[in-house]
Amino acid sequence: MRIVLFCENKYAIDILNPIQEHVTKQHLPHEILWYIHKPKIDSFPYADQVKWTNSIQEVYDFQPEAIYVPGNIVPYYLPGVKIQVFHGYAAEKKDHWIIRRYFDTYFTQGPYFTSHFEALAKRYGDFEVLETGWPKQDWIKENLHKYDADREKLLRESGKETLILYAPTFSPRLTSLPYIKEELGKLAKERNALIVMKFHPLTRQEWVDEYREWAANKKDVLFIDKGENVTK
């Protein structure tokens, strides 16, 4: 089977890579092409390891039989079954249940999402639903303690007892970013903690700039800039 792993945003890479790894480890007879959207992704960490392109024309010429997409849209004119791989768990987002008619199949994270999309499938009648889990969780499970030494090094160098990760959603309606900055500072002092912050790539730039500047003046806050993998 010819498979395209379609990455419009950088976070899609870590979501889809477990699929590449599974095919490679199992020696499955599939040919994989990655699409990396150059305007939003300035570097591809697996560039020397896999087949990839920045060209939609090359994707078309590849004649994929399946396209995996951790996003809401994909060019309708590309051949192959188009599969949405969900990229989070925020079911309360207002646009989570919108059917945009781009996909033939929705791969869901768990029973709650499956039941809702199965109901939508009955209403629309032009897509299928399959509960697969979320591939990015595979990496987390397999590497659960891989970076314990890195964590201890961070705590040792910062002189802190606890590490706290703050990774808010970008959605303006749901994010805590406008309200929580000073509370994070208090939490760091009360818990003798190092606050590690990583923002979604679609976060408003003014919020990113505000928190980056704030973190630069604090010894107990570490700002992870976009492009860095927060799972390490």
Question: What does each of the following model-derived ranges do?
Answer:
Residues 53-58, 203-232:
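Donor nucleotide-activated moiety binding/catalytic core segment of transferases
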Residues 4-144, 148:
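Active-site and donor-binding regions of nucleotide-sugar-utilizing enzymes
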Residues 59-75, 158-168, 172, 226-230:
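Extended, charge-rich low-complexity interaction segments
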Residues 111-112, 134, 200-202, 226-228:
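An acidic- and aromatic-residue-enriched active-site/binding cleft used to recognize and process polar
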Residues 12-24, 137-214:
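Conserved catalytic-core segment of nucleotide-activated headgroup transferases in glycan assembly
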Residues 25-32, 190-195, 219-221:
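A generic structural motif
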Residues 1-7, 164-167:
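Short hydrophobic beta-strand segments
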Residues 1-2, 80, 158-162:
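A short, charged/proline- and glycine-enriched loop
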